[in-house]
Each structure stands twice: as C-alpha cells, then as structure tokens.
Amino acid sequence: MPKPTHTPKTKICLVTPALADANNGNWQTAQRWARMLSTTFQTRISPVWPDSKPADTTADVLVALHARRSAPSVAAWAHAHPTRPLVLVLTGTDLYQDIQHDADAQRSLQLATHLVVLQEQGLQALPEALRHKAHVIYQSSTPLPPANKTQAHLRAVMVGHLRDEKSPQVLWQAAQALQADDGIFIDHIGRALDSASAKQAQQTASQCPHYRWLNELPYAPTRRSIQRAHVLVHTSRIEGGAHVIMEAVLSGTPVLASRISGNVGMLGADYPGYFEPGNAQQLAALLRECRQTQNQTDGLLAKLTHACQTRAALFQPEREQADLCALITSALKPV
C-alpha cells in the first residue's frame, strides 16, 4: 500500500520591528497572533524578512506589522515573491501619521495584497482606492472576572509608556485639577522614554498625593491593576486600536478616553466616556462625575460599564483567531 501523503503546513513569517524587550502593543499583537496562527499554520516571528534563518526563504505568507518600520521587509518580499500573499497590519502611527506623508509607508500600502486595521474607524483613514483590500480584525485578550471594588473612593489607572503619542501631560494636568478630598486616586503605569517625562511624572506625584507614577510593570500586575481600578483613563492623541482599552473592557473596568478615531473605533460612536483630545479639564470633570455618581445605578460609571459590556464580544480571543485564520486562508486562495 502506498504511504499516506502528509500535506505540509503553510509557513508564515510574522515580521514585527518591536520585539519582546519593547513590551508594547505591537509586540503583544505579534506574540498573540503567532500563537493563534500556529494552531493551523507553521508560524515564526522575526524583526525583518529575510533574516539569517535558511527557512526564511520558504515562507508562504508574510504578515508584517507597521507600514513604515517594516517597509524594507515588505519591499523585499514583494520583489522576491510577487505572487505570494503579503498581509500588512497597520498601527496607529501608520494610519494617522505615516501614510499621510511617508513614502516608504505609502509604498508598503501599495505592495500589500491585504491590509488589516485593528478597529472599524481605521478603514476611513485609508486611501479610498485601497479600502477594498482592507479587513478589520479586533484584538483580544483573556477575559477576567470583574473585581469587587470599594465604594469609599474612585481609583483610576492609566497604562502606557510616557511618550508624546500617549499625551501623558493630559493626565498630569487632570491630576493637578483634582483636589485631594475629591476621593479620586490615579495610578500611572508606564516607562518614561526621556528624562523630561520622568521629571514631570515625579513632580506631579510630589504635588498631588492622589497621583502615583508606578513606572513600568510586568504584564500580569498591570492587568491586575486594570481589573481592580474603577476606570481606565486613555489620553492618546494617536492610536490604532489600544490593547489596554480591550483589556479593561474584558476585565469589567470602564474607560474614559480621548475622542480620537482609534478609540471611537474600539468603543463606538455613542460611547458616553469621551473627552476631547488634550482637554484635561474635561477629563477631570468626567472623573469627578464618576466619583460623585459612583453608588448610583444610573450614574456615569454605571452607564460606562454597561456600554463597555456591549462591546466585549468584539474582543474575544475566539473571534480574533477565527478572523485571523480566515484571512490567511482566503489570502492563500488563487485569485
């Protein structure tokens, strides 16, 4: 009898310029996608394509994160394998900054056979002529049960490295606008990427006893902090689809967020917890309202919690994995 033939798994090279030491959303996406894809495909992560590994040249599909930073890999793949799928995942800086003016990022958009945005508003940021090859895949995380939270005060948490795109100054200004007797405590988690940011965080902490800068924390305690907080604050001015938002939603923690495309695409156009980008006074007012109505079933905090619950289904791991594998399977089909 002839031996049964074994169809080898499709090989995927997942390129991400951000590797583990970056500890940011792009690395978390790459790591999670590699794990999800590996159930169906042979998948590995690399900072570039091609790299020094001999198996690199045999990949069937390239999945690249970041149009500008992965541009050399995108161009090399398109030149070496013009008929093979090239999936480009667009980050916030891609959508709302780089593709507007950066030639490398624009070329990556043209070379990709498939584009991925991480929330529904991302489609509108793409050139209209390219939207036909774009797909929305919401990121996911492991759901956590809501924690029992005190009613004696309101604890807010903000998570993100201290850099310009995250607008940490909005949180610092909001902390300055709050009074110590407002019953609102703020935890700020994230590494300072320059000495000026570290100094500002330390200065705010010294002036505002209700504000703490906890610096960078590992993933597990960061998620616990989100889970235990009454509300997550997200002040970014540019965002492609923030990990921390869906992690908060999946932990039973509602969100106060800047009204930018990336956040609206995650939380919905009618979400009641937005403040205008850069407006610390609005953020402080929302925090006060959350605190003042904390024990009311029809208060702002309760409304935010309900609104987040209605979005939670978008961020389930099973949905993300199914959408991702369906995209790769579709990309492999002959045109």
Feature-to-residue mapping (PLM):
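Short hydrophobic beta-strand element within catalytic cores of glycosyltransferases
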Residues: P254-A257
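A short, active-site helix/loop in glycosyltransferases that binds the activated sugar's phosphate group
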Residues: Q110-A134, Y138-L144
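Aromatic "clamp/platform" in nucleotide-sugar-dependent glycosyltransferases that forms part
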Residues: R237
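Nucleotide-activated donor-binding/catalytic signature segment of Leloir-type glycosyltransferases, i.e.
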Residues: K199-L217
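Conserved donor-binding/catalytic core segment of Leloir-type glycosyltransferases
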Residues: N148-K166, W172-Q176, I186-I189
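Glycosyltransferase donor-sugar binding loop
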Residues: F185-K199, N215
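Conserved acidic donor-binding segment of nucleotide-sugar-dependent glycosyltransferases
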Residues: A269-Q281, E289-N295
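A charged, aromatic-enriched C-terminal amphipathic alpha-helix characteristic of glycosyltransferases
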Residues: G25-Q28, D298-S330
